[in-house]
Amino acid sequence: MKLAHWMYAGPAHIGTLRVASSFKNVHAIMHAPLGDDYFNVMRSMLERERNFTPATASIVDRHVLARGSRKRVVDHIIRKDKEEGPDLIILTPTCTSSILQEDLKNFVDRASIISDCNVIFADVDHYQVNEIQAADRTLEQVVRYYLEKSHTLDQFVTDAPSVNIIGILTLGFHNRHDCRELRRLLKDLDIRINQIIPEGGSVEDPKNLPKARFNLIPYREVGLMTAMYLNKEFGMPYVSTTPMGAVDMAECIRQIKKSLETLAAPILSSKRVDYESYIDGQTRFVSQAAWFSRSIDCQNFTGKETVVFGDATHAASITKILAREMGIRVSCTGTYCKHDAEWFKEQIKDFCDEIIITDDHAEVGDIISRVEPSAIFGTQMERHIGKRLEIPCGVISAPAHIQNFSLGYRPFLGYEGTNQIADLVYNSFALGMEDHLLDIFCGHDTKEIMTKSLSTDISPIWDPESRQELGKIPRFVRDEVKRNTEKFARRKGILNVTVEVMHAAKEALS
């Protein structure tokens, strides 16, 4: 457990609740004190759904601490079974209530005897894992539970090419838009979708998962454990290459073709798809990003530096797109997914100057302040950091705020996703001449000059004459001049920045 003002990944019970509320007709009960039950409000605000979030709290209060939780938890499960009639109830403690060390598994076993629905206890170590790891583990636990419960399974694969999409879930970054784009891609490839879990799926669906010819895991964060379990138990191949960016899109499609050819069962399809021709046609004529990367607009990015930070999937993919497809220098790339650090480093080692693995936002902020990139691509926290440093930021990963749960169609995966990413990259960079013209003609950019830095060091104080002189400098280089002057002043031990200090700093740099 960790006390922090900001966490990139929430506590473990949030991951369990995300999986539970993604399935249809599944109810989650969290054994928690008041204050830990904010998931309902958060999901209702961000997802903007009509339906209520199917999660309630069995509150730990002074009465529970005095007499124990068994009666309250069991009664809560039975009451929700009668009121809601769910197919499954998942009970999870929170990191706070886990301190009590109660045998909740025993409570679940007792409630299972009385209730009509299935009841399981989320088997997650709340002291060791975060939201992402817990979501991955909970999904695998639900799939395993229903497959083992079925006893006799129809393991005959479909005659036509078919796939399971695993890992689309509520509060995921643009997950629903990505799911629509994956549907379009698979339809073009004449591949039938067998199941999509957990988002919108039923808990009765997992027993049909082995009928598909392969599994597609669009994000490493959630779904990989389930795919590995299905591969071990049923020999199902899986594709875990994220179809983000033109190059990885092509690689993902080639892996899909390879996976379909793995099984000995013959494929009966209404049409034969030429995968290489499809890749060529989509890359050249459907995706606008391919020609845009060779245009004069994209060439203007030459020499620009960026910093990328996010979950392992999005940070790695965006880094490769920037460096390999758009020719933009990535000074530093990082992720807060410490558990996937080895894979992350292997993916982006040839595409950036520096790699950082951390869940400390202050450390990320210090790196951004040191590198002084032209643009940042990160989470909501990097957006806040960028605002403080007056560096533009494009949000490419969770955690994100409500503006990144758009009502419009904005996928990151697939060929339409390449267009969205190209737009995001282009619009995230500050165009120097545009800012300069806005300054000259008193455009919308009329805010005061920012003289505070992100660093906790004492910043030199600018006198009125030096502020006025700084205001005469074109805005697209003003921040750089300000930072270089302050660095010079700190190095020389100067506390007050004057016009003379500005000129001295300029001479020292030239």
From Swiss-Prot:
Its cofactor is [4Fe-4S] cluster. InterPro entries: ChlB/BchB/BchZ (IPR050152), LI-POR_suB-like_C (IPR013580), Nase/OxRdtase_comp1 (IPR000510), P-CP_red_C (IPR042298), Protochl_reductB (IPR005969), Protochlorophyllide_Rdtase (IPR016209). The active site is at 297 (proton donor). It is found in: Plastid, Chloroplast. Keywords: 4Fe-4S, ATP-binding, Chlorophyll biosynthesis, Chloroplast, Iron, Iron-sulfur, Metal-binding, Nucleotide-binding, Oxidoreductase, Photosynthesis, Plastid. Pathway: Porphyrin-containing compound metabolism; chlorophyll biosynthesis (light-independent). It catalyses: chlorophyllide a + oxidized 2[4Fe-4S]-[ferredoxin] + 2 ADP + 2 phosphate = protochlorophyllide a + reduced 2[4Fe-4S]-[ferredoxin] + 2 ATP + 2 H2O. Its EC number is 1.3.7.7. [4Fe-4S] cluster binds at residue 36. Binds 1 [4Fe-4S] cluster per heterodimer. The cluster is bound at the heterodimer interface by residues from both subunits. One of its GO terms (biological process) is light-independent chlorophyll biosynthetic process. The keyword Transferase does not apply. Transmembrane segments: none annotated. GO terms for cellular component: chloroplast. SUPFAM superfamilies: Helical backbone' metal receptor. Gene3D superfamilies: 1.20.89.20, Nitrogenase molybdenum iron protein domain (3.40.50.1980), Proto-chlorophyllide reductase 57 kD subunit B (1.10.8.550). The keyword Zinc-finger does not apply. One of its GO terms (molecular function) is 4 iron, 4 sulfur cluster binding. NCBIfam families: DPOR_BchB. PANTHER family: LIGHT-INDEPENDENT PROTOCHLOROPHYLLIDE REDUCTASE SUBUNIT B. Protochlorophyllide reductase is composed of three subunits; ChlL, ChlN and ChlB. Forms a heterotetramer of two ChlB and two ChlN subunits. Component of the dark-operative protochlorophyllide reductase (DPOR) that uses Mg-ATP and reduced ferredoxin to reduce ring D of protochlorophyllide (Pchlide) to form chlorophyllide a (Chlide). This reaction is light-independent. The NB-protein (ChlN-ChlB) is the catalytic component of the complex. Belongs to the ChlB/BchB/BchZ family. This is Light-independent protochlorophyllide reductase subunit B. The gene is chlB.
